[in-house]
Amino acid sequence: MTLKMFLPVNLVSVCMKLNNSVVMVGLYYGFISAFSIGSSYLFLLRPRFLNDDPDAIEKKASETAGFFTGQLLIFISILYGPLHLALGRPHTILLLLAPYFFFHFLSSNSGQYPSQRFAFPLLTKSMRNRSFQLVFLHSLLFQLFSLSVLGRPMLTRLSYIYIFRSNNKMLFVLSSFVGWLIGHILVLKWAGLVFVWLLKFIRSKTMKYITCNVLIPATKYIIEKWRNSFVAGLIREILAMKQVESALVRIKNSRLLDDVRWWIRGSGLISGLKINIRFYARLILRGFENVYVGAKFRQDMEHLFSIILFAFFLLYLDRTPLLYADPADKKLQLQRKLSNETQAAREEKELEERLTEKFEAQRRAQRAAQRKALQEFKQGVVESYLANQAAKDENQIQAQKDEKQIQAEKKATIRAEQVVQYTFGLIEAQRREMEIEAARAMQEAYKGMLAAEEEDVEEGVQEKQEGFPEEPISPSEEREENPKLLILKEKISILTEKISILTEKNDLFSFEIPIITSLFDPQKPLRPLRYIKTCAGVEKAVKNEMSQYFFYPCRSDGKQRLCFTYPPSLATFWEMIQRKMASRFPRIYTKAKWRALRGSAPGSYRQWISRNKKKKNSLSTEFQNRIQTLDQKKSLLNVLARRKRSSLQNVLETRKRLCNYKTKKEYLPEIADPFLTGALRGKSDPEVYDGVRKTSEIKVVFLKNNITMATLGNKNDDDLREEKNAISLLSRMKNPVNKLHLLFVNERDYPFVKPLVNRINGPAVPKKKKTISKSKQNEIKSKQKKVKSKQKKVKSKQKKVKSKQKKVKSKQNEIKSKQNEIKSKQKKVKRKQNEIKSKLNEVKRKQNEIYPKGVKFNATPKTEINPHGIRFDAATIEKYSFATGYSYRPPSFHDIIFKAFVTEPQRNKKKVIELEEEINKQVPRWSYQLIDELEQLEGAEGETQFSDHEIRILPFKRVSVFTEKEAKKKPLIDEEGNYVRHKKTYAVRFLGHMSDFRRGLIKGS
């Protein structure tokens, strides 16, 4: 039995199981994450250099302990959300980084500058006594910094992602931690071996391979100098090298390249650069040697590590977003606001011009129509006066008077409505402002009264206590008993509520920008590597705000999982909604409710599994039942012989079909239906189709299987039912859409279907043809013709009678409708009169409330302004009133917009103007505008002046295009006639023949 385990097949299966297990995956990811070496490893590698230090072993132990505790905290933060947020927020990073750098600076530079102000003797002594604790803190804090500030390696992030994807999280975490431990032990051992080999190599060579022709005087003095101020000297030398390099580049790209080349060769710039580079290399290798030779250079090595750490920070912080808001972004926002305001003002002016033009055109048309109407009216009056001068009926005069009265009332109602619409808005706005001011003033007055009353109460209590020392009374009890104070407090609370209601806005979804985001913007995207201009006319590059790899939890397969490409804007919006709804409705939207919605509740996954199991069981049982029913009922004859209701209608699955949602009976034809496939797809009978026709002669038959329609006449219900069933069954038997339709037969159809089935399944017996004489056939045909002719005559008479009846009914309906219209118009006029009276009364009442008695309110001033901004002078009003005969009131905003554009929909459908607002999206762009060296030179020669260039390009040379002779031949002359000097035109010639991969790169990226 034991030998069977070592068979190759079993070994392969065991290996496959181990590879697919969570433990092996965790070990693999943990082992990989150990090799992602970052800046935090520098503290582990530093004591390996300092073996001669007496406290080296203790420092190693403290640094490894801090390293492992930091990693443990990071592992805990993966599974514990608040800790992860605390370590990842910029506020906590700032609180950790600022004091860390300050104390690190004091501790490292305490003995180097004894005469300067950076030396704090009390602090330095306490720090030196606690050196091991400081080493522990250094290594621990660097692990926490590497989570957010320093670059997080990709290999460690893979393990974090897999935790969310795995089912057994604890097993994976434990196994990955074990793998990480094994990997770190191997890395440390390997580093120790490498350093021992380096030591042997350096001792064997003893720096013989570094030689220099130029003598460096007083090397010991230089080393002592660097020991005292190593960092400052190195920074100075780096800056000097940069200055030399920039000077060389400028000289190289200048126009006097040939003249200055001899100076570069003769000068000692290049040799000086070589000496500096050799000196730095020699200094570093001398440090490696002196660590093991003597203890003098130990401090220099510590300074070297601090320089490397500083370089790491500069590297990582250059690519991270700024912790404060960019002032250029604020300028851009102000510019956008100003541009939007100017665009809105232009659009408003254009709208006003269009509206004024249309209003003037309407006014001209109205004047022309009025002139024509006046001329026609005069002619009609003269003719009627001459024709009917003798005989005048009192009824006609009264009717004319009634019409004039109705028109006058209509005009009066229109005028009053316009007055009310214009004045009511102004009055209401003024009333609201006056109410707010009055409420605030009353609130301040009540507060002053309340303070005075409280002082009086305190004085009275003191007097009572002096007069009656046996029964002391507290001021709080006196305040509670005093009714004046209670009344004042109630009034102040009512006024505060009133002010809040008047100045209230929809605060449910108004997400205000907090103060912290102005200082810290963690969602601000990083600076790009290359500066790519998308369009020729666009000045600034487009900003990619949508992150391609944003991780956020989402629901998948009934479980909360990690989504790799979740939109960050949606995630922040969801979190803001949670906060707002939880603050507004804390009882309804609890934590359990949000977890259930997101799918992270503890019992949600079990519920999902149980639901899926139930669905699976129900589907399997249904499938088994269908197979059993199909096996039992093998043929249609057995079903019909038993005379039992067929259950095969529920055996086959009814498919979804497209229909009209209003009637739910109008289905698409089977050819055009995308849901139907298989045998039904592409086969249809013109006589058999689904549809609805709402006529008197055609009726539709709908069965359970969406069967067909048949044309029937006006008959009884019982006859109709029988004929419907017969026709539907015949159509299915003759022209079946699918053979399975033959199985769907009800019990009530059995007597009709039985003879058909017997004919189909019975023996084929030849039938004798009945012979009829020709004379009888002719007689039958003649009788049929006579019957048809009589039927036609009867039908024609019936149609004539029906048409006459319809005409009579239509006339009666017209008379009734006219009577009803007259009554409704009279009622509407009365209602409008009552409404206008009530509105005018309200306006007068509000005027009396707001304005004092001495002030008068003019509802119709001489110069009036519409809500849309059009001004009407008194001259235009007088002209219009003289032409029309009644006083003019300028139309409202509603009348100008809607009455000008709305037309009759039946006649002029194409002339209707649709006012549509264009939805514009502002493309996010970078706040800065980067330029290259060529653009910088062009701007320096022209009017625009740019700052220093920040984009790399190929080395180029400017070549002049024209000569002085050509300029003299073709002189330039201004508009005034003065001669103008020719501007020099240059052509750019790029010197790099090879492909330059640095082209388009941003400096510092």
From Swiss-Prot:
Residues 783-810 have a biased composition (Basic residues). Residues 811-824 have a biased composition (Basic and acidic residues). Keywords: Chloroplast, Membrane, Plastid, Plastid inner membrane, Protein transport, Transmembrane, Transmembrane helix, Transport. It is a multi-pass membrane protein. The chain crosses the membrane at residues 25-45, 67-87, 91-111, 131-151, 177-197, 304-324. InterPro entries: TIC214 (IPR008896). Pfam families: Ycf1 (PF05758). One of its GO terms (biological process) is protein transport. One of its GO terms (cellular component) is chloroplast inner membrane. It comes from the Eukaryota. The keyword Chloroplast applies. It is found in: Plastid, Chloroplast inner membrane. Its main location: plastid. Residues 457-481, 767-833 are annotated as: Disordered. Belongs to the TIC214 family. Part of the Tic complex. Involved in protein precursor import into chloroplasts. May be part of an intermediate translocation complex acting as a protein-conducting channel at the inner envelope. This is Protein TIC 214. The lineage of its organism: Eukaryota, Viridiplantae, Streptophyta, Embryophyta, Tracheophyta. The gene is TIC214.
